[in-house]
């Protein structure tokens, strides 16, 4: 994991810190379950607070997997196959990492029944070599957040987890939204200037990176998008 016993001595030693490019670690021990407080929230707050201490250097999440129920012989116990589990674990964790100034998210591992692609294990939710739901979740961030700088994003909807990004020359804005509820939302985006939506895709329990519905609000500075229940939706402007 990312433990203060290891990272603090480096951060607090000028000579060691000068030889450091990246602070990297894993996010086990329930990083996403901050509502329970205590140890989990303290770990989350510590890790997400690293950025302010790094003086322009970065922190990376370097390994995680979500495989609850894998040891059971009963398929009903294989939680990692369920869409709501994938969205509420991998999706939520990547979102929280992006909010916490993380610069790279690496999942372990790529081709495995609980990973990004199916394998020949009987527990695999998709055929060998096919992209699983976790793969589509990660691809939203790979396509819409890579090589960008995160910018502030606010939403009045507590169940709509949103991050926004801008490219290096400031000509392209992207938004990734996780709708963590049973209700569809007609979301109005407010980028602060006239824009054209050039791409909008959504992944749900039954769809993978399919075109999302763009809503014409009659205002080029406030484009709209329909965000389906329990979905991840990404928009490029």
Task: Please identify what each model-predicted range represents.
Residues 1-90:
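Noncatalytic carbohydrate-binding groove/subsite architecture in carbohydrate-active enzymes
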Residues 18-21, 54-59, 100-105, 146-147, ...:
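Loop/turn elements at helix/coil->beta-strand transitions in domains of secreted/extracellular proteins
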Residues 23, 97, 138, 175, ...:
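Conserved, mostly hydrophobic/aromatic
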Residues 27, 63-66, 106-110, 177-179, ...:
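Active-site proximal loops enriched in glycine and acidic residues that flank catalytic Cys/His/Asp
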Residues 58-140, 151-157:
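Aromatic/acidic polysaccharide-binding cleft in carbohydrate-active enzymes
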Residues 155-195, 230:
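Carbohydrate-binding surface patches
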Residues 191-209:
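Solvent-exposed beta-hairpin/edge-strand motifs
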Residues 214-237:
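C-terminal beta-strand-rich structural cap/linker in extracellular carbohydrate-active enzymes
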């Amino acid at each position: 994991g990312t433990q203060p016993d290891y990272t603090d001595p480096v951060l607090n030693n000028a000579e060691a810190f000068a030889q450091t490019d990246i602070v990297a670690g894993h996010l086990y021990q329930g990083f996403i379950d901050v509502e329970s407080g205590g140890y989990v929230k303290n770990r989350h707050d510590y890790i997400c607070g690293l950025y302010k201490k790094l003086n322009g250097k970065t922190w990376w999440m370097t390994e995680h997997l979500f495989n609850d129920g894998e040891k059971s012989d009963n398929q009903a116990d294989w939680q990692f196959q369920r869409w709501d589990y994938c969205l509420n674990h991998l999706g939520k964790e990547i979102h929280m990492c992006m909010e916490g100034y993380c610069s790279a998210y690496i999942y372990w591992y790529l081709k495995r029944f609980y990973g990004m692609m199916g394998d020949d294990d009987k527990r695999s939710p998709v055929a060998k070599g096919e992209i699983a739901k976790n793969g589509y979740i990660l691809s939203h961030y790979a396509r819409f957040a890579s090589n960008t700088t995160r910018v502030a994003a606010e939403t009045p909807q507590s169940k709509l987890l949103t991050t926004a990004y801008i490219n290096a020359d400031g000509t392209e804005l992207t938004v990734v939204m996780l709708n963590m509820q049973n209700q569809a939302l007609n979301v109005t985006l407010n980028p602060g200037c006239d824009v054209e939506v050039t791409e909008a895709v959504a992944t749900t329990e039954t769809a993978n990176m399919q075109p999302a519905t763009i809503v014409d609000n009659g205002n080029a500075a406030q484009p709209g998008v329909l965000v389906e229940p329990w979905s991840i939706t990404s928009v490029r402007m």
